[in-house]
Amino acid sequence: MLHQIATMPNFKFLEDIAIADAAFEAYGDTLEELFGTCALATFEVMVDTRDVKPEQKEEILIKDLNLDDLLFDFISELVCLKDTHKVFFSKFDLHINKNEEYELRGTVWGEKIDYKKQEVRRDVKAITYHMLEVKEMDNGWRAQVVLDT
């Protein structure tokens, strides 16, 4: 079963972490919700995702040995898709399994970038490993992410 993130994402931007970059802390009850919230926060740096219609979809499959690398590769894939397909994403249905390694399968939806319709805040070039952390808490999951803008 695929999990969709809640309509009100649980993240906050961290202004004092990286001056030239964008940083945020995200939360989720499940890993799927956490990763979806991180994806949404990444695109919120660039655009008001409420203005991005889920008209175009992409399938994603990522495998990694640990959660930090899985999140890094997931966000990297989204940034790459944004750059190559010229799409902002706003909806994320994800499923994460753990066997010998973590596997993220999902569908992401977005809309072609339209500078007349969408006000672009700033461009995200990449996710960084600086202060990157995915951590299980007593009441769910937390991630800290710094993006190169």
Outline where the language-model segments fall.
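N-terminal intrinsically disordered, cationic/polar leader segments
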Residues: 5-149
